[in-house]
């Protein structure tokens, strides 16, 4: 298989890894959404129905995760190795992924804090395309810098940990990079969550959060996000790297043995 040929294995493995990780950490995602909403935790649903909205995510996770790894691996193979490679590749891949994931993210988060069915939320959203545009911008505003930063850290940590631990090097690197990224970028996640739940401009959301809760309003769910991101990314990328190695999927620039 040449460098110019489409490699279906990373695409498939990336999609399936995303499904596994999303399903396992979804209850934590629900709790974080309810903590970060403008409602009280109990008003938003408390600890009830933690898997509400999962169907919309599962439908979109496979194509979004698959497209991410397709673009990421493709871009990596066409640049010189290094930090800039990982930064650019992850950023471009995440923009593509967000275009697929944004509608499902709106449905998921609205379903997580209300009793409205997924189908009803989806139907109302179709008639208000601006909600999707706001969601896409908010998601890109959070996910692109987060993913770029995260993958730069991940590639470095993975290389370091894998030198002494071939089995758990990737999960360890993913967990650490996920925790650091979540801690740094929680304010963007809070803003994105509130845009999805109550469509407003970025500026209005920032002003409202600060007015209602001060500077600490941007750190809602910090501890939960660090834990969930660390766990989720460890499962996601750990599974991806593990299955990829067993399928003999080559790295950029290596000769395929599949």
From Swiss-Prot:
Pfam families: Mito_carr. The keyword Cytoplasm does not apply. Gene3D superfamilies: Mitochondrial carrier domain. It comes from the Eukaryota. The chain crosses the membrane at residues 11-31, 53-73, 87-107, 139-159, 171-191, 218-239. It is found in: Mitochondrion inner membrane. InterPro entries: Mitochondrial_sb/sol_carrier (IPR018108), Mt_carrier_dom_sf (IPR023395). Keywords: Membrane, Mitochondrion, Mitochondrion inner membrane, Repeat, Transmembrane, Transmembrane helix, Transport. GO terms for biological process: mitochondrial S-adenosyl-L-methionine transmembrane transport. GO terms for molecular function: S-adenosyl-L-methionine transmembrane transporter activity. Solcar repeats lie at residues 9-78, 81-160, 165-246. It is a multi-pass membrane protein. One of its GO terms (cellular component) is mitochondrial inner membrane. Belongs to the mitochondrial carrier (TC 2.A.29) family. This is Uncharacterized mitochondrial carrier C1271.11. It comes from Schizosaccharomyces pombe (strain 972 / ATCC 24843). The lineage of its organism: Eukaryota, Fungi, Dikarya, Ascomycota, Taphrinomycotina.
